[in-house]
Swiss-Prot record:
It catalyses: uridine(13) in tRNA = pseudouridine(13) in tRNA. It comes from Xanthomonas campestris pv. campestris (strain B100). Keywords: Isomerase, tRNA processing. Its EC number is 5.4.99.27. This is tRNA pseudouridine synthase D. The gene is truD.
Length: 367
């Protein structure tokens, strides 16, 4: 198991090379809220459009503006600074007296909407994200690219965790191993080492990276076998747009119809303590895919950390996927994804896209 493995493509070989995020406007993300504001309460709900600023920076800025601790700021998800993004923040103001909103507006940040709500905005409280991505310096046959996009819209894609989850050069996986009490030798084998003690936020980041690496390992096996979007004996099914899981149960025409209309998806493990939800062939593939020494070390560490077995859909279908050629070498994509899903997974099925923000000296990984 590699810290930054090359993932297989489900739709065949790459059909393009391109660059993304040459400028921040080439990567636009708008949150799709999960609820309407109540219009009352002591949390000021702000919709903020920002350029070149990540979520943590804006949260700190809002806390300073309101004169409150940062724990009084809520947001549903993290957004990268190398982008133009719109997202909600809640600001706890018990007296319902807000400072001058215009003081927040500048060239790189604007409050586009504000209202009151009766509770703090919680992580994950969003319906999804809408993306508008502009790829530049595109090299590839337009007919083949158009066909690949139509195939993605019709069949979906593997629901990979994006490379952002793993840090630069996959370093978060190595850091997770160190946290669990392992060090990698020069020959690639693992040896016991003193466990690293970390802050809670760092620990959470590394636990997520370890889980994500194991999930991607299972998904790799399913893609290589060609059954990432097809039923196996013993499959555990995940409802679309939900964390609900059911099965295993005998294959039937009802399940076939639900799978065909993307109401359910095959699932893979988010590792933790407890029994695998799947069985038979599906469980055999998962155990085989995670039987190497590094995977076993990550599994043991996650179980010891108190995480429980959960599931994640193996398949993802971008919603409202559309594209337009702005010129012969510039392709614009628009689509929406559920929370926790990665736009880079869509781009990977197209080809090799260089992230200009990552190769620039000032770049940092997405948040």
């Amino acid at each position: 198991m590699s810290d930054s493995p090359v993932l297989p493509r489900a739709h065949g070989a790459a059909v393009l090379t391109a660059a993304m995020r040459s400028v921040a406007e080439d990567f636009q993300v708008d949150e799709l809220p999960a609820f309407d504001a109540s219009g009352e309460g002591e949390h000021l709900l702000l919709s903020v459009r920002k350029r070149g600023q990540n979520t943590a920076y804006v949260a700190k800025r809002l806390a300073q503006w309101a004169g409150i601790a940062e724990m009084g700021i809520g947001y549903a998800g993290l957004k990268d600074r190398h982008a133009v993004t719109t997202q909600r923040f809640s600001v706890h103001l018990p007296k319902r007296i807000a400072p001058d909103l215009s003081a927040l507006d500048d060239d790189d940040m604007q409050v586009v909407e504000h209202t009151w709500h009766n509770r703090k905005l919680q992580r994950g409280a969003l319906h999804g994200n809408r993306f508008v991505l502009t790829l530049r310096e595109v090299v590839g046959d337009q007919t083949a690219i158009d066909a690949r996009l139509h195939a993605i819209a019709a069949r979906g894609i593997p629901n990979w965790f994006g490379e952002q989850r793993f840090g630069r050069d996959g370093g978060n996986v190595a850091a997770a191993l160190a946290m669990f009490g392992y060090t990698r030798q020069l020959d690639g084998t693992l040896a016991p080492a003193p466990k690293r003690r970390l802050r809670n936020d760092q620990r959470s980041l590394l636990l997520s990276a370890a889980r994500s690496a194991l999930f991607n390992q299972v998904l790799t096996a399913r893609v290589e076998q060609g059954d990432w979007d097809a039923p196996l004996d013993g499959e555990a099914w995940m409802l679309d747009g939900s964390r609900s899981v059911f099965g295993p149960e005998p294959w039937s025409e009802v399940l076939a119809e639900r799978l065909a209309r993307f109401d359910i998806h095959p699932s893979g493990p988010l590792w933790g303590a407890g029994e695998l939800r799947c069985s038979a062939d599906a469980a055999a593939i998962e155990q085989a895919a995670l039987s190497d020494p590094q995977s076993l070390a990550l599994r043991t560490g996650l179980e010891a950390a108190g995480l429980k077995q959960e599931r994640r859909a193996l398949r993802l279908r971008p919603q409202a996927l559309a594209h337009a050629w702005l010129d012969a070498q510039t392709l614009q994509l628009t689509f929406a994804l559920p929370p926790g899903c990665y736009a880079t997974a869509v781009l990977w099925e197209l080809g090799d896209v260089v992230d200009a923000a990552r190769v620039a000296p000032q770049s940092r990984s997405e948040g």
